[in-house]
From Swiss-Prot:
This protein's name: Phosphoribosylformylglycinamidine synthase subunit PurQ
Residues of the Glutamine amidotransferase type-1 domain: 5-234
Active site per database record: C89 (nucleophile), H206, E208
Species this protein is from: Chlorobaculum tepidum (strain ATCC 49652 / DSM 12025 / NBRC 103806 / TLS)
Gene3D superfamilies, sorted: 3.40.50.880
Role noted for this protein: Part of the phosphoribosylformylglycinamidine synthase complex involved in the purines biosynthetic pathway. Catalyzes the ATP-dependent conversion of formylglycinamide ribonucleotide (FGAR) and glutamine to yield formylglycinamidine ribonucleotide (FGAM) and glutamate. The FGAM synthase complex is composed of three subunits. PurQ produces an ammonia molecule by converting glutamine to glutamate. PurL transfers the ammonia molecule to FGAR to form FGAM in an ATP-dependent manner.
Domain of life: Bacteria
InterPro entries hit by this protein: Class_I_gatase-like (IPR029062), PRibForGlyAmidine_synth_PurQ (IPR010075)
Keyword Ligase: yes
This protein's record includes keyword Nucleotide-binding: yes
EC numbers on record: 6.3.5.3, 3.5.1.2
Gene: purQ
GO molecular function (one): ATP binding
Record SMART domains: GATase_5
NCBIfam families in UniProt: FGAM_synth_I, PRK03619.1
Length: 234
């Protein structure tokens, strides 16, 4: 794989930045670069990841303050040029707050923070983030959030579905999008979406926490592999 540089944005309150750094660095030829929230430069990165955590303490709303960070102006411009941006958990929340992705992430239906292993299925494998998966493949990936309930207008949901922008869904172990599997109440069991251009992905589950056998699952690793292979032209 050709050399690839991946920026990982660190906000005050981020707590998955080093987990993400570890997962990224495990790929030969891929170099993680930490980007501070006050930076005005993406340092020549080929892709940007917004990691999980509680940016700015989740005051006002999850991701509501982080969207105004200086670094986000650069990320928005970067995404506008068609460059890859990945938002994980709190990173997904930041992406919807700044308008790079549609919809909103609201309080879980059960009104509780949920931290556990979950199963999701690949709804669309024709993206730069998922082409190493099979469509319909079921993955074991952990979640840890209190506001991961994906919500959007009926028109937006219809558009996301018809355009193939729903990338991951909460399902049971057999790939069925049941009410029981939809622990946070997300519309249409949505766990992750991509923008119309296909270069910005947000998901609530944590692929970096499912990147090696020691963690109980390697199912998240191929998301990174898909992205890095795309960047390297492999």
């Amino acid at each position: 794989m050709a050399d690839v540089t991946v920026g990982i944005v660190v906000f005050p309150g981020s707590n998955c930045d080093h987990d993400t750094e570890y997962a990224v660095a495990s790929f030969p030829g891929v170099k993680p670069v930490m980007l501070w929230h006050n930076d005005h430069d993406l340092k020549g990165c080929d892709a940007v990841i917004l990691p999980g955590g509680f940016s700015y303490g989740d005051y006002l709303r999850c991701g509501a303050i982080a969207r105004f960070s200086p670094i986000m102006r650069e990320v928005i411009d970067f995404a506008g040029k068609g460059r890859p941006v990945l938002g994980i958990c709190n990173g997904f929340q930041v992406l919807v707050e700044c308008g790079l992705l549609e919809g909103a992430l609201i309080r879980n239906a059960g009104r509780r923070f949920v931290s556990r292993q979950t199963t999701i299925s690949v709804a669309n494998n024709a993206t730069i983030f998922t082409d190493r998966y099979q469509k319909g493949e079921v993955l074991r990936v952990p979640v840890a959030h209190g506001e991961g309930n994906y919500y959007a207008s009926p028109e937006t949901i219809e558009s996301l579905e018809s355009n193939g922008q729903v990338v991951f869904r909460y399902t049971d172990a057999w790939g069925n999008a049941t009410a029981e599997a939809n622990f946070n109440g997300s519309m249409n069991n949505i766990a992750g979406i991509v923008n119309k251009q296909g270069n910005v992905l947000g998901l609530m589950p944590h692929p970096e926490r499912a990147s090696e056998k020691l963690l109980g699952s390697e199912d998240g690793r191929r998301l990174f592999e898909s992205l890095f292979a795309h960047l390297a032209g492999a």
